[in-house]
Regions:
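Conserved positions within compact, well-structured domain cores
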Residues: 23-26, 125-376
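Surface-exposed binding patches on compact interaction domains or structured appendages
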Residues: 29-32, 45, 51-88
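Short, solvent-exposed loop/linker segments at the N-terminal edge
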Residues: 37-43
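A short beta-strand micro-motif common to beta-rich folds, especially ectodomain repeats
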Residues: 87-91, 98-112
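Bacterial Sec-dependent N-terminal signal peptides
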Residues: 3-37, 110-132, 316, 368, ...
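Intrinsic-disorder/low-complexity, polar/charged segments enriched in Ser/Thr/Lys/Arg/Asp/Glu/Gln
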Residues: 43-47, 84-88, 101, 117-121
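Beta-strand-enriched, solvent-exposed domains that form extended recognition/catalytic surfaces
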Residues: 22, 27, 31, 71, ...
Length: 376
């Protein structure tokens, strides 16, 4: 009996010594970690990569709500073994006015209960919507209730080879300086002040807005082909079509049909108030009025004596053909007298922004809309 107990004691001691001699588990280690940067406001799928000596998990909120807008994020896969880890992060498009910050947690797990896990917070930022033109000018962008991204500022890009003009006898300048009320409130004037240009943008004739040379549109067929063109908009954006315009504001002139379900139609008209409540920042900025190809001098449109403190009307270009006029046969001029496209006409007096026809010779504002394929 004595010898048996002694033997058991020796076995127990040996077991304890082995336990004491056991090599501690290596601490969790994270190396070769990449960062998620350069996310566009349109979101997308991005990879977070790392090397780990342990099994790992990732976790983060599937939904984040900001100012009433819910954003859905995705993490795939949510766990993995030691080695090279790759997590695909699905990032939503930013539909608000401010940047969005989001983070998720990576945890490296030890096999031994006494091994402390390694936890790492991974952060990313979705920038506020904006777009930059070919000259480096950056514009605010807004996501509107029609389900599209629109520029919330007027274009102020000068195409190569053109110079903004103040000469009202130059009816083929292509680009004109913006308009404002004179200091004595007695008329509309053009302004080359940099702050005014930033606030109001330049005024463009339609062919320039479409990226074409002045007087290059000669037929109805050519005019119809420019619908939805990028023109002088940034890549991935376009001059709005009649569908874009009517789905936004609802009301338009004949032959275009009313859309009474449009989000900014108030039951009677397109509402500047409703549009600006959603930060579209639309106003009446005036226009360079050139009625048709028979005119040799322009006038400044938008100022009225009965409302002298503001510019009362203006135009925003659209790219859908609306109507054409030809010179009468037998006259001194032949061919196209005028081509009209459907645009938007903001009117400060009654607060409307309905679809309207405008001559392709008029110098008007440009607001670009993001292409659907790019947005999605």
């Amino acid at each position: 009996m004595f010898f048996a107990l002694a033997a058991l004691g020796l076995v127990a001691m040996a077991s304890c010594e082995k336990e004491a001699e056991k090599t501690p588990e290596a601490a969790p280690e994270l190396t070769n970690e990449t960062q998620i940067t350069g996310i566009p406001f349109t979101g997308g799928e991005f990879t977070y990569e790392f090397d780990s000596n342990k099994k790992w998990t990732v976790a983060g909120d599937a939904e984040v709500t900001i100012e009433g807008q819910t954003y859905e994020f995705g993490l795939t896969p949510t766990s993995g073994d030691a080695g090279h880890g790759v997590v695909t992060v699905t990032v939503p498009a930013n539909k608000g006015a401010e940047e969005i910050s989001y983070s998720f947690t990576l945890t490296l797990l030890g096999e031994d209960k006494d091994t402390k896990p390694l936890t790492k917070t991974v952060s990313l930022t979705i920038p506020a919507p904006s777009v930059t033109d070919a000259a480096g000018n950056t514009y605010k962008v807004v996501y509107l209730k029609d389900g599209n991204y629109w520029m919330a500022e007027n274009l102020r890009y000068v195409p190569e080879g053109l110079t903004p003009s103040k000469d009202l006898k130059n009816v083929t300048a292509g680009v004109y300086y913006p308009i404002k009320v004179s200091d004595d409130h007695t008329k509309a004037i053009q302004t080359s002040d940099e702050n005014d240009i930033k606030a109001y943008g330049y005024l463009y004739q339609a062919e320039t807005a479409f990226g074409l040379a002045i007087n290059s549109l000669k037929t109805e067929e050519e005019a119809k082909r420019v619908e939805g063109t990028q023109g002088i908009c940034p890549k991935g954006w376009h001059i709005p079509t009649s569908k874009d315009i009517i789905n936004l504001v609802g009301k338009s002139v004949s032959p275009f049909t009313l859309n009474d379900k449009a989000p900014y139609y108030d039951g009677k008209n397109a509402s500047i108030k409703l549009l600006n409540e959603d930060s579209f920042n639309i106003a009446s900025w005036g226009a360079i009025s050139i009625q048709d190809n028979s005119k040799t001098e322009a006038t400044l449109m938008g100022w009225m004596k009965n409302n002298p403190d503001i510019i009362s009307s203006g135009y925003i270009h659209g790219s859908t053909f609306a109507q054409k006029y030809e010179f009468p046969q037998g006259g001194t001029q032949t061919g196209i007298k005028n081509i009209q496209f459907l645009g938007i006409m903001p009117m400060a007096g009654n607060g409307t922004a309905n679809g309207a026809k405008l001559s392709y010779k008029i110098g008007a504002s440009v607001r670009c809309m993001m292409d659907k394929a790019t947005k999605e």
